[in-house]
Amino acid sequence: MVLEMLNPMNISSMVSEAVLFGSIAILLLIGLLLWVWNYEDTSSIPGPGYFLGIGPLISHFRFLWMGIGSACNYYNKMYGEFMRVWIGGEETLIISKSSSIFHIMKHNHYTCRFGSKLGLECIGMHEKGIMFNNNPALWKAVRPFFTKALSGPGLVRMVTVCADSITKHLDKLEEVRNDLGYVDVLTLMRRIMLDTSNNLFLGIPLDESALVHKVQGYFDAWQALLLKPDIFFKISWLYRKYEKSVKDLKDAMEILIEEKRHRISTAEKLEDSMDFTTQLIFAEKRGELTKENVNQCVLEMMIAAPDTMSITVFFMLFLIANHPQVEEELMKEIYTVVGERDIRNDDMQKLKVVENFIYESMRYQPVVDFVMRKALEDDVIDGYPVKKGTNIILNIGRMHRLEFFPKPNEFTLENFAKNVPYRYFQPFGFGPRACAGKYIAMVMMKVILVTLLRRFQVQTQQGQCVEKMQKKNDLSLHPHETSGLLEMIFIPRNSDKCLEH
């Protein structure tokens, strides 16, 4: 019996069984450790697992790799319309549910945005300006200047100023035409937006072409640096080109603002020229704002329209070119309401088809389709507990394709044939941190469409359309400008023929 126990075959069998049971025990122990490790991070909100900190790294990397907008759509599709990830190690909710979005937008404790502090410092937005100013007190101090400039007399003046600008630029269309006669619509729109903004808010002669290029460089830097981890800023050569782009625009704007300061100091009468920049400069003189904050506010006011609205109108023109029945409806209303005369402020409320077209374009092909916020106090949203300091991304573009609209995945004016409750359609947001320029933006888009479409019919190259266009959905959704076929054909209209509609 002793010999049998010492038999090599029996010893091997015992060793194999011991290894098997030992392996199972180790796996169970690892599983227990993982469960204990993740226990504190377990959330009732759907989302990827923590996995010893690997989950947060993967989710942050996905935002850097795919872009903010694309990553939000990916995660909402994967985990539902109210889900949780991590950005920079911080818990971040991605929400595309209308009731939750409505709750967040209307409450004051969600007025703060989030982003990399070092990234925002690099582009000059950390605790300055209005767009990504994360200091609620400083944000509240500058917002009234924007609200005043973008409403009241400024809103009334926008019609004439914008109409004059687009007429001027259409008269020299050869500047943005290539050798084949195709029009670079993006450059055209950016110049019109910049010129209009300058005439309304700054009033200093500038080099449109050079400044438009600098604005694009600044936006690229803003988009690239907004969510970068702190380690990125430890390696100077990684962000040097972005730093230069930011400096180029800041330096150019500082020269213009200094010229404005000089004109103010030597002017005998200012009553007729108390524009946005002048108001800020006087606030600086009273000690209410720093010089750096004034410069950043002016910079942001000047880049807002060339940055996003130019792309919005670009997409609209492509949609018009691809939907002739929509173009016919637009032209019928334009010639009924405006006719051959100059567009006026009292036309704005009468252009209902144009307005519905703008809304449907912004719903179907948004440029800014999400909003970033931070919870400033504990809350409960649709039954989910939300802790103070939680980052939140409101995926508005996805919401616009999930709820209410009869044909959410089609471009059709039928989607706005009836009044849409504002909780289901929020292209500009609402509540205390809604877009300050939402009313003036609507006026500007109406004026541009009416003025341009009365003079030209637009066509795309080789059947190009927004659905097939190569796009990047990061801080905003925009076309890949090197992909080709983005220029359009502008055909002069026969006014008499148009009036027959």
Curated annotation (Swiss-Prot):
It is found in: Membrane. Its cofactor is heme. Its main location: membrane. GO terms for molecular function: aromatase activity; heme binding; iron ion binding. Its EC number is 1.14.14.14. CDD domains: CYP19A1. It is a peripheral membrane protein. Transmembrane segments: none annotated. It comes from the Eukaryota. InterPro entries: Cyt_P450, Cyt_P450_CS, Cyt_P450_E_grp-I, Cyt_P450_sf, Cytochrome_P450_Monoox. Ovary. One of its GO terms (biological process) is response to estradiol. GO terms for cellular component: endoplasmic reticulum; membrane. Heme binds at C435. It catalyses: testosterone + 3 reduced [NADPH--hemoprotein reductase] + 3 O2 = 17beta-estradiol + formate + 3 oxidized [NADPH--hemoprotein reductase] + 4 H2O + 4 H(+); androst-4-ene-3,17-dione + 3 reduced [NADPH--hemoprotein reductase] + 3 O2 = estrone + formate + 3 oxidized [NADPH--hemoprotein reductase] + 4 H2O + 4 H(+). The keyword Membrane applies. Catalyzes the formation of aromatic C18 estrogens from C19 androgens. Belongs to the cytochrome P450 family. This is Aromatase 3. It comes from Sus scrofa. The lineage of its organism: Eukaryota, Metazoa, Chordata, Craniata, Vertebrata. The gene is CYP19A3.
